[in-house]
Amino acid sequence: MIEKLRKYQEEIANIEYTCNLLSWELRINAPKKSQNDLVNLISYYDMKVFNLKTSDEYGQILYDAIESEEFSRLEEAEERYIKNLLRHYEQFRKVPETFYNEYSKMKNNANLVWRDAKENNDFNMFKPYLSKIIEMTKTYYTY
């Protein structure tokens, strides 16, 4: 069961790594013409991660892993890590999918505006995005 959890975690990590690379590309190198496509692609993969991290299958894998015989043979740090994954899973499931999708898109679009604001030395253009990100982050942590 622990191996199944490791494989599931690896899939999540691979998609998160892809998101990070795409986000870096968006901030550093992406031509203006491709920026909206990259924002949509990053949001798509963010939602894939969200769905993996909130799925019933993932929850069952976590519960089964903790109840397995293998779990009792793990190092203490590994046990804490898996229990922490379960705690995050239970918290993350409370976040509505539509909210998370909007939150993801907002952060990715804000990256575009931030890039332009830095280039033009006009940080007022980023202000509304920053306010919205702060507002949405506060909402996110109420779930």
Give the predicted meaning of each segment:
Residues 1-143:
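A well-structured
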